């Protein structure tokens, strides 16, 4: 296992290369300990700040198939930032080492951490579509106004491609930051009030499905645009689940744009899909 850490505020960096014993039960805790110890040795603080973190885990199945989990994210906390850093890495290591499907031989783990004291965070204030009428399959530009911490507001433009199967009529879109969960509360409330479309019968999930969940999970530094409701029966039928996990995964139309900072907040817009 190799861990590289940079404290950008102090201009200090360091790394550690450690050989881990082959023990599925202990692998997650060893990964957590090596990461945390390396970070604390270089950063030498327990305060707040922003962390950029990326990692990859390579493994091999019993049948010789190559397995890879690769992930990056950003975190911010006003205190205890170091304890947040290894959570996703430990989750990924736990999946590979202790999954119920098959034995995975993990042979490489790499992690890179960059820490800073500044809060690299901006909140979505508003969102405005550049046009109010779009066609199915057309790309829609959305201007998103953001308020950073103790700085002037600015605007970023993100793109959303209208699903080809989207029926004519009003289409509500939710524009949110990857670190925001306020939209989730509103969605669950709306589902309770309006009823939830019938879902497909859940399919049996495989290890590859769980790996894909980690590799494709939302990042805190993304602006995410998704259809805010599922009035279209064709799209609703594609949802295999209607609970919290499915809401977090979003609809098949969800699209993401990566930013160089953590994005919080949410905004809703409405456009007309024409025939």
Language model feature labels by segment:
Residues 1-275:
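Long, low-hydrophobicity ectodomains and other hydrophilic envelope-associated domains
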């Amino acid at each position: 296992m190799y861990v590289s850490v940079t404290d950008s505020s102090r201009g200090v960096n360091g790394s550690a290369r450690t050989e881990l014993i082959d023990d599925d039960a202990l692998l997650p805790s060893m990964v957590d300990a090596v990461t945390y110890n390396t970070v604390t040795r270089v950063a030498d603080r327990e305060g707040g700040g922003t962390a950029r973190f990326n990692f990859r885990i390579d493994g091999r199945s019993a049948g010789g198939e190559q397995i890879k989990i690769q992930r990056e994210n950003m975190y911010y906390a006003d205190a205890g930032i170091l304890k947040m850093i290894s959570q996703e890495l430990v989750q990924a290591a736990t999946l590979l080492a202790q999954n119920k499907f098959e034995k995975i031989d993990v042979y490489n783990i790499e992690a890179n951490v960059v820490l800073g004291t500044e809060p690299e965070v901006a909140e979505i204030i508003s969102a405005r579509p550049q046009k109010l009428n779009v066609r199915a399959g057309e790309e829609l530009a959305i201007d998103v106004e953001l308020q950073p911490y103790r700085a002037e507001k600015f605007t970023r433009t993100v793109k959303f491609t209208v699903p080809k199967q989207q029926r004519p009529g009003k289409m509500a879109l939710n524009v949110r930051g990857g670190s925001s969960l306020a939209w989730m509360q509103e969605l669950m409330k709306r589902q309770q009030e309006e009823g939830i479309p019938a879902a497909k019968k859940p399919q049996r999930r495989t290890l590859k499905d769980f790996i894909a969940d980690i590799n494709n999970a939302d990042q805190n530094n993304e602006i995410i645009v998704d259809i805010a409701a599922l009035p279209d029966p064709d799209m609703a039928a594609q949802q295999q689940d209607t609970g919290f996990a499915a809401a977090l995964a979003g609809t098949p139309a969800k699209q993401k744009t990566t930013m160089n900072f953590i994005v919080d907040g949410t905004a809703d817009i409405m456009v007309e899909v024409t025939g």
